[in-house]
Structures are given as structure tokens and as C-alpha cells.
Amino acid sequence: MPAMRGLLAPQNTFLDTIATRFDGTHSNFVLGNAQVAGLFPVVYCSDGFCDLTGFSRAEVMQRGCACSFLYGPDTSELVRQQIRKALDEHKEFKAELILYRKSGLPFWCLLDVIPIKNEKGEVALFLVSHKDISETKNRGGPDNWKERGGGRRRYGRAGSKGFNANRRRSRAVLYHLSGHLQKQPKGKHKLNKGVFGEKPNLPEYKVAAIRKSPFILLHCGALRATWDGFILLATLYVAVTVPYSVCVSTAREPSAARGPPSVCDLAVEVLFILDIVLNFRTTFVSKSGQVVFAPKSICLHYVTTWFLLDVIAALPFDLLHAFKVNVYVGAHLLKTVRLLRLLRLLPRLDRYSQYSAVVLTLLMAVFALLAHWVACVWFYIGQQEIESSESELPEIGWLQELARRLETPYYLVSRSPDGGNSSGQSENCSSSSSSSGSGGGRGSEANGTGLELLGGPSLRSAYITSLYFALSSLTSVGFGNVSANTDTEKIFSICTMLIGALMHAVVFGNVTAIIQRMYARRFLYHSRTRDLRDYIRIHRIPKPLKQRMLEYFQATWAVNNGIDTTELLQSLPDELRADIAMHLHKEVLQLPLFEAASRGCLRALSLALRPAFCTPGEYLIHQGDALQALYFVCSGSMEVLKGGTVLAILGKGDLIGCELPQREQVVKANADVKGLTYCVLQCLQLAGLHESLALYPEFAPRFSRGLRGELSYNLGAGGVSAEVDTSSLSGDNTLMSTLEEKETDGEQGHTVSPAPADEPSSPLLSPGCTSSSSAAKLLSPRRTAPRPRLGGRGRPSRAGVLKPEAGPSAHPRSLDGLQLPPMPWNVPPDLSPRVVDGIEDGCSSDQPKFSFRVGQSGPECSSSPSPGTESGLLTVPLGPSEARNTDTLDKLRQAVMELSEQVLQMREGLQSLRQAVQLILVPQGEGQCPRGSGEEPCPATASGLLQPLRVDTGASSYCLQPPAGSVLSGTWPHPRPGQPPPLMAPWPWGPPASQSSPWPRATALWTSTSDSEPPGSGDLCSEPSTPASPPPSEEGARTGTPAPVSQAEATSTGEPPPGPGGRALPWDPHSLEMVLIGCHGPGTVQWTQEEGTGV
């Protein structure tokens, strides 16, 4: 896996800081929540406090941090009040008092209350420290404190005169909190500052930012990455030049003739020296994954790892030579040690190995670098073969063959005593040397004799030929034009071919199976990282959430190295898996909770344990979540929150969860559990726990009792629990309204006889029907009652036993509760008397409307329906049971009966309304009729037969007028002597409008007069089939009795009445309110009336 960046997320290290600063006798403390006024519950309890008092952590948690459960008879009442006052006012307090252990033994305690603030400056926690000072108090004798006056007078020392709490503050506790136990230089200034200066800084309960010196470099920072880039280039330069200078320059140039070092060599040495300095100030990642910022730790870590190698590689040979410092002739050979710096590049380059292009580029660079090294060594071997000859040159070396082909052979020249060169040459050498050959300037002697080696190919040709041989040997078996002749050359060629075979497979195999096996784990890590980044990019995850995802993935990978433990151990036998699980989870299984468990039970429980990981700021459990496991904190710290209030702080060794629930019970968490630092947990699944306890039932009761005492915080206390009942999920879909249920409860006193189960049910009311048509057909009084089914057993219905007054008066809320849909007045109600066949007209759905059960009628059966529900339209539930069908039938009958009664009430109301309209219109006609004079009454005031009336719209109000034809003909009736005046029949009335008649074959005669018409100039309003009458005389208009107009003539056509000039007057269907036919006088035309409808 690539080198990790380290765990750099901000963490709340308050608990770790307190735990590290408190040790020994000063570790007896509790932390109380200062945000819960009045109670200040304990959210954390140290192990030392439990050992001191004898109480377990579970017994102390959520109690008051004043530790009133430790009070006893000898505890000073004054100190109690002062402790309570200090907690309420969020102030520091210190006192000495007597407390009692759980066993009842008293002990002197030095109590110190210290408020802890958060990042907002608010007091978030109380640190209550307890120190046992019984030995100090009892030095004069075990009962010395009693002889001096008892406990209450002496133990309230904090309230005595002259006591200063600030001056008597516990130096040990505060020094531990502020880190003053470290050695500090002694001086007067620092002593005065520590005594009279400001108080030491206490740790704050907040998310701590990364603190580091400005002179400390982050190992994954941008500055360090840039510096590593320069070091990479310098290392590659060293890897190329050092082998060349060692193999080529040493062989062909004397050491005294070497020139000054180049600028690049000096710059590289300076970079290596500065790199050593920076490494002492660069952070590193510890084995636990934490980033170390302490300078001392950084220096110690660097000295024990790479320091020695970097010092040897950074020896400034070239720099000393530049300053004319005499260096040993072979000292520059130590430069080869710098090649070891390539090992340092591997961890740094590993982060780029997930990119295939970078991998191929690096492999090609490594292959070329290796070929360069092989070429240098091959040239050095050939040169040494020539110089090793004592008296004559060898003729089988590869350089000798190259010299003959290039016609630049080697030759030996004897050196004369005066320093000149002799002309004696060996017979196989040419007489002249090439001035262009680099060997012409050499001054080396052969074998210490007076012979000097000259001639040979140039250095450029020799190196290119060596590189050609190296590449041909590494990539294949070579072509033979440059071959190994001597034994030394052949041995080196063999090694080169072996290396070449490996490099050929790695580079030209394009990362095949060998590479996949070598980097399988790395590929898996990069593959998952790439998938995670692609997921983040596709779904546009915000940056904070993206960082949390990457941090969690890297942290979990560091814990398990990408190994799926479940899949890995699945192939192993159960016996071996149990032993491995017990070894992995031995820290959890060593808890007192599992002391009574047998080894078999422990093995079963270990298989149910799973590792878990939580990063800072992550919620392990949310309030209201179903608790499915118990969690044991192995490392790190967490906090329990509820509504932003800290209820508990959990550290290493704490157990969180709930008491053992039943197998079908679901327990909901009553608080949130949030990680403060990187936490490693062990998770015990409740499902696996139940299975294990089912196998070992003798351990279940003891485990359940012990779990209550071991839980650091019970997340199930007061939580919501529910029994999982799968039977409630399967049931018949019954449509039953609430009002029906209430009515059923209220009618339990009535006798209900269920209908036979084999009777078919009629359809329900279709929801797709229009409100008008559905309601009209439902309200039809001619709808036939359910007919008895032949051959069926009749059962008395509920309607037969109802009281006679069980009508509308018996149900005062029936009329208001009847939610009838609105019906427009211009649409006549559908009063069809036909029997409903299950599918109504005008519906958008073919679903059935009503469900009737037809039974055999008996003497007690009633055809009138029973009162129904108050929910408006009927909702008849369907059910498989016979009793439910019977109740549905009875309710339907009651609803139909109630609707019939309401229709009768509406009929009576309409009649009353008709009479009221007559009383209103008749007086208006007497005084405002435009046709009558001031002395004579309006003709409309006289009662007569049912005749078409005319509405005058020219006046301020409407009045009814008789038709002109009847007045002219003298047919308007007058009262006869001795007889009451005939009743005037009401007529459909309303203001004129612009629409046609809503009903066919129906005619009403309307006329309209205005103020512009002269009196008496009104046109006759007669049917089109009636001939026009002659003009009437004035006397005849007042006294004449017109002939009655038959109803057949009035209704023989459906055309609207003609207006002035023979034009038809339009109907007004929107203003037409009602159509009612009154009583008939003697001699009048008898109007037909539909039975039961009032029309």
C-alpha cells in the first residue's frame, strides 16, 4: 500500500489529554456535564475513582458530579452547600471533607472542582478531582481527627476564616493539567511568574486544530513535495554520472589529470546536505497512523532510519576538491554509495503507481538506467583485459576487435629514460596512431614497465558500442557482432542475459501476470480508490463529505490492509476460525462480563464479533436508530449526545449499547454516539448474540445481569421498543370509516342478525361517477327495495326492531352530517324508477356502486332502510366474515331510510318556500303593476286558474300578470257571490334570461315590459300554436272573464314563448329555482303529479 498521508482530521483530544496528565493518585476524577443545570450528571469516570470509592462505572454514570452518593453522617453540611454553589455558579472550588466508600468506610478527601470551557468560552464540563488524604490527616493516630473535635467543625475548612481557595489550590492537579511537571530552568523570573502570575491554561473541550511549529514541514505538504522533486532529479543525475565516472574516467585518465568538478556536481552535493537538515524538521507517520509533530520524536526517528545513509551519500568530495583540499585518490569511489538513495525514491514514487502511464514511464527509465550501468561495466571489463597484458596486447578482447574494425588498433610504446617515446612497436600494431583517438594522450604504464598503451577507439565509439551490447543482451540474446571472447566477458554476458530476461518480461510484457501478482494488493487499493473518486465525481459529492469518505477509506485500509476477513476465513474450518476469532478479540472476551462463560460459549461469541472503525465527527449511532449491536471501544474516545447535550464521554474499555432485548424486540437508541478521535471498536451483533445464548442457555441469565453493570451508557434506557408482529401485515383490505365504527359501538344494544354467507353482494358506489347523477339516483324514492331471495333463509333485520321515532329526530346530527354533493338547479334530478343493475349511467368507471344482501323477508323485515352513517356517501366494507356482511347490510338499510326521511323533509320545506314566495310577490304586484291604474288592483292579485303568467321587468320588482288574451276574452276568473275566491295556481317564475328551456316539451310564457312602453301596450304572450286575439276593450280588460287556456295547448310544444314582434324569448335556466304545482280549484285543469315527488 502507498505511504499514508496520516490521520490529519481535527480531533477532540480532551479525554486523552486528561488521561495522560493524570496519573497515580491524581487519576481519581469524574467529568460532569455543566450544561444540565441542577443535576450536572457524570459523563466520564476514571478507573482510579472506581478503585477509590468501590463503585463501578455503570453505577457512577449519570449521577451528579457532586458525588452526593459518597456523603455520610460526618460529611460537613457547609461543604455540601459550597460545592453546590460552586457548581451552580461555574466557579472553581477546593475543600477537604469526609466521604464514604461503597463499603461504608470513611476517608478524608481533597476535592477540587475545576470548570472546563469549550471553544465558545462556555463552561461545558466540570472536572471533579478526588484525592485520598487520610494518611496525612491520621498521622497522629487513627482517631486523631475525632479527638480534635469531630468531623463537621474541622472538615469545613474551606469556609473557615482566613482560608484562601486560590492559594490552597492543588499544585499537583493543576500542574498535571497544565503540563508543568516537565523540567524547567530555575530562575527568579519564572518562579515569580508561576506563583504570582496568571493561572495555568486548562485543556478545553473542543475540536483541537493541528498544532505545529512554523519551522516544521508537513511530509505531505506542497513545499515538501517540491523539494522532493529536486531531490529526485539530483538522485537521477547521481545514478547516471557516478557509474560513468567510476568505470570510464578511472580506466582512461590518471587521477592527477582529473579536472575540477562541474557545477552540477557541486549543486547536487549542496542539495544532499540541505536535505539532511530538512529531514530533521519534517513530520512522519507513526505505526499507529498518527502524524508526529514533536521535533524530538522527529529527530530520533530520522537518526534511526535514513540518517547514516544520507550522510555517506552527501560526503562533499567534489566540494573539497574545489577548495584545493587533498583528497585520497580513491575517495571518489565512495560516490557509489549515493546510489542507495534510489531506495528512498520508492516510497515517494509509489503514490504515482496507480497511473498506468507513469508506471510505464518509470519502467522504461529503470530499464534505460540499468542498460547504462551494464554498458559502463562492460567497457570497464574490456579496458581491464587490455591493460592486464604483461608484454603484448591480447587479440581476443571486444575492444581489440572494435579497434581493428575501426582501424584504430592499440599499440605499446616504450618510454625512454629522457622521457621520450621509442618507435619500437609490436608487429601486430600499426606504425602510426590516430591523432583523433582518445588513447593518444594517455600516460598510463602497462604493468609498471616502461611500456605505454596508446591508440584504440575513441571514448565515444567505445561507450556507444558498450551500450549497444547492453541493450541487445537485455532485450534478447544478442546479434553476435559484439561478442564476449574472454572468460570474464562471458561470465558478465551470462549475468546480463539473466537480468535482460527479467527486464524484458517486466517492460515489454506490458504489466502482465507477473506484475499483477507483484502488485495485486496495490492494484486493489488503487482500484477501490479510483472507484470511490469516480463515484464522488459522478454524484457530485460536496467537498466536506468527499474528504470524510476518503479519510474513512484510508483509515479502514490502514487497519485491515484491504483484507476481507470474512471472505478470507470463510474457507477455513469452524474450529480454526473460532480459534483465530478468539485471538483477534481476546481483549473483549477478557471483560468481567464473560468470566462465567464456558470456552465453547466464548468461541461462539467470538464468531459474532466484528471490527468497526469511526473517524472524528462521524456518528456511530443516531438517536432513534434500531440498536443492532453492542460496541466495545478498543481505542480512541467518543461522546454521547442528546439534543446537543453531552451525556457521556467514552474511552478505551467502555461498553455501549442496551440491555439484552428479547429476540423479536426492537430497541431504539435514545441518544447519538459520535466519534471524537479515530476509534477502533469491536461490534457484537445482537443476532449472533441471541444465537450464541440459545446454544448456551445457562449463561444467558448471568450475561443479562452482568450487562447492566458493565454498560458505560445504556442507549436503550427509555428508548422506544416495539414487538415485530408480522401477522398484522397480512389482512383483508376492509373499507370501514371511523363513523361506522363509532356507530357500531353505539348500536351494540340492538339485535343484529347476520345475513346468510352465501348471498351475493352488490357493487359499491363507483368513485368515478359524477356527484349529480349519483346523488340523484340515490335519492330517487321509487328505487325498489331489495327483493327477497328465493329459497334463502330469512333473518329479521335491524329495521324491524327499531323504534318508530328513530327518524331524523332520533339522529340530530344526521342532516348536518349528510355530505350530499351539490346539484345545480338547472339539471333536473334523475328520478328514474328503474332498478339499479350495478352500473350507473354517467359514470367513468364500471365498478359497482352498492352492496346489497337480499334475504328472505319475514314478518319482522322492513323494506324501509335503516339509518346509515354520518359520513356522506355510503362506504360499504367488504369482508370475508358473515357478521361483517350482516352489519354492512343493516347500515345500508338504515342509510337509505334516513335519506328517504330527509327527502320528505326537503319536500315539506319546498312547499313552505312556495307559499312564502306567493306572499312576497302578491303585495308587490298590487302597488307596482304598470298595467293597472291607481284605483284598480292588478289583475294578478285575483286568484284564478293555473295560467301562464308574465313577469314585468321594467318595474323595480317583479310582478305576475295574467295573459292579455284571457283578459280580452273575459275568461279571467272573478269571485262568485257566496263562494270563496279561487286559488291562484303558482307558476314557474324567475327573471328572463338568454338560454333555452332545460326540459323538452315544457313551455313557460314570459314577457318583458319596460318604462318606455305605454301602459296597455304589452304584447300577448301566447304559444305559437294559439292564434292572436283581437284587441280588448278597457272594460273588458277589467271585467271580462277570459277563457281558460288548456294545459295541453300550453305544453304542446317545447319551443320557448314568443316575445315582442314574434321573437322567441329565451329561458333562464341559471335563475330557475323550483318547479312546483299547487292545489287545484274547482273547474280548473287537473295537473298530473308524479307520485311521491311533489312535481
From Swiss-Prot:
<feature type="short sequence motif" description="Selectivity filter">
    <location>
        <begin position="476"/>
        <end position="481"/>
    </location>
</feature>
<feature type="compositionally biased region" description="Low complexity">
    <location>
        <begin position="857"/>
        <end position="872"/>
    </location>
</feature>
<dbReference type="InterPro" id="IPR005821">
    <property type="entry name" value="Ion_trans_dom"/>
</dbReference>
<feature type="domain" description="PAC">
    <location>
        <begin position="93"/>
        <end position="145"/>
    </location>
</feature>
<keyword id="KW-0406">Ion transport</keyword>
<feature type="topological domain" description="Extracellular">
    <location>
        <begin position="383"/>
        <end position="464"/>
    </location>
</feature>
<comment type="function">
    <text>Pore-forming (alpha) subunit of a voltage-gated inwardly rectifying potassium channel. Charactherized by a fast rate of activation during depolarization followed by a rapid inactivation at much more depolarized value causing inward rectification due to a C-type inactivation mechanism. Exhibits a rapid recovery from inactivation.</text>
</comment>
<feature type="region of interest" description="Disordered">
    <location>
        <begin position="740"/>
        <end position="823"/>
    </location>
</feature>
<keyword id="KW-0813">Transport</keyword>
<dbReference type="InterPro" id="IPR000595">
    <property type="entry name" value="cNMP-bd_dom"/>
</dbReference>
<feature type="region of interest" description="Disordered">
    <location>
        <begin position="965"/>
        <end position="1069"/>
    </location>
</feature>
<feature type="compositionally biased region" description="Pro residues">
    <location>
        <begin position="974"/>
        <end position="991"/>
    </location>
</feature>
<dbReference type="Pfam" id="PF00520">
    <property type="entry name" value="Ion_trans"/>
</dbReference>
<feature type="domain" description="PAS">
    <location>
        <begin position="18"/>
        <end position="90"/>
    </location>
</feature>
<feature type="transmembrane region" description="Helical; Name=Segment S2">
    <location>
        <begin position="260"/>
        <end position="280"/>
    </location>
</feature>
<feature type="transmembrane region" description="Helical; Name=Segment S3">
    <location>
        <begin position="303"/>
        <end position="323"/>
    </location>
</feature>
<comment type="subunit">
    <text>The potassium channel is probably composed of a homo- or heterotetrameric complex of pore-forming alpha subunits that can associate with modulating beta subunits. Interacts with KCNE1 and KCNE3; these interactions regulate KCNH3 trafficking to the plasma membrane and its subsequent voltage-gated potassium channel activity.</text>
</comment>
<keyword id="KW-0631">Potassium channel</keyword>
<feature type="region of interest" description="Disordered">
    <location>
        <begin position="854"/>
        <end position="883"/>
    </location>
</feature>
<dbReference type="GO" id="GO:0005242">
    <property type="term" value="F:inward rectifier potassium channel activity"/>
</dbReference>
<feature type="intramembrane region" description="Pore-forming; Name=Segment H5">
    <location>
        <begin position="465"/>
        <end position="485"/>
    </location>
</feature>
<feature type="topological domain" description="Cytoplasmic">
    <location>
        <begin position="353"/>
        <end position="361"/>
    </location>
</feature>
<dbReference type="InterPro" id="IPR000014">
    <property type="entry name" value="PAS"/>
</dbReference>
<feature type="transmembrane region" description="Helical; Name=Segment S1">
    <location>
        <begin position="229"/>
        <end position="249"/>
    </location>
</feature>
<comment type="similarity">
    <text>Belongs to the potassium channel family. H (Eag) (TC 1.A.1.20) subfamily. Kv12.2/KCNH3 sub-subfamily.</text>
</comment>
<dbReference type="InterPro" id="IPR001610">
    <property type="entry name" value="PAC"/>
</dbReference>
<feature type="compositionally biased region" description="Basic and acidic residues">
    <location>
        <begin position="137"/>
        <end position="150"/>
    </location>
</feature>
<dbReference type="InterPro" id="IPR000700">
    <property type="entry name" value="PAS-assoc_C"/>
</dbReference>
<feature type="transmembrane region" description="Helical; Name=Segment S5">
    <location>
        <begin position="362"/>
        <end position="382"/>
    </location>
</feature>
<keyword id="KW-0851">Voltage-gated channel</keyword>
<feature type="region of interest" description="Disordered">
    <location>
        <begin position="417"/>
        <end position="447"/>
    </location>
</feature>
<feature type="glycosylation site" description="N-linked (GlcNAc...) asparagine">
    <location>
        <position position="428"/>
    </location>
</feature>
<keyword id="KW-1003">Cell membrane</keyword>
<feature type="transmembrane region" description="Helical; Name=Segment S6">
    <location>
        <begin position="491"/>
        <end position="511"/>
    </location>
</feature>
<keyword id="KW-0812">Transmembrane</keyword>
<dbReference type="InterPro" id="IPR003950">
    <property type="entry name" value="K_chnl_volt-dep_ELK"/>
</dbReference>
<feature type="topological domain" description="Extracellular">
    <location>
        <begin position="250"/>
        <end position="259"/>
    </location>
</feature>
<keyword id="KW-0472">Membrane</keyword>
<dbReference type="InterPro" id="IPR003938">
    <property type="entry name" value="K_chnl_volt-dep_EAG/ELK/ERG"/>
</dbReference>
<feature type="topological domain" description="Cytoplasmic">
    <location>
        <begin position="512"/>
        <end position="1095"/>
    </location>
</feature>
<dbReference type="InterPro" id="IPR035965">
    <property type="entry name" value="PAS-like_dom_sf"/>
</dbReference>
<dbReference type="InterPro" id="IPR014710">
    <property type="entry name" value="RmlC-like_jellyroll"/>
</dbReference>
